[in-house]
Amino acid sequence: MHIHILGICGTFMGGLAVLAKEAGHKVTGCDANVYPPMSTQLESQGIELIQGFDPEQTKLNPDLYVIGNLVSRCNPLVEEILNRSLPYVSGPQWIGEHILRNKWVLAVAGTHGKTTTTAMLAWILEDAGYAPGFLI
């Protein structure tokens, strides 16, 4: 499946792109600003990056668009996707349906300490003999 990710250079969407690539999908993506370190990491995975949100990107003809939370409704590429009724999902929806399906999920939320708490939780689970995955 070819997935085109809007907002690919954000931490969450970049992580999603790598997970999708590792799962065997063809991944391309775009963002308003494409620069290191995220651009370097994604390009090293063989993920094509496009600067900007030109509606012409629909000519890539992906099977699915994954739209990041920071990409607004007035975005020209989003409007083209909606006007043409092209298939799209949010990043969290794609992760839930394709990566986290049939897995136990522990989520850490809050204003401060999420990364530290997640790291401690992953370490505790690993030390207890589990093989946790994690996404920060």
Regions inferred by a protein language model and the residue ranges of each:
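Short glycine-rich, polar/acidic loop-and-turn segments at beta strand-coil junctions
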Residues: 31, 53, 69-71
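Short amphipathic alpha-helix with an adjacent loop that forms part of the alpha/beta core around
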Residues: 53-62
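Phosphate-binding loop of NTP-binding sites
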Residues: 19-22, 43, 57-58, 69, ...
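Short acidic-hydrophobic, aromatic-tinged amphipathic segments that line or gate anion-handling sites
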Residues: 49-53, 89
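Histidine-centered active-site/metal-ligand motif
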Residues: 4, 25, 53, 112-113
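Short, ordered loop/turn segments at secondary-structure junctions
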Residues: 32-33, 54, 93-94
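ATP-dependent carboxylate-amine ligase
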Residues: 1-34, 38, 43-48, 61, ...
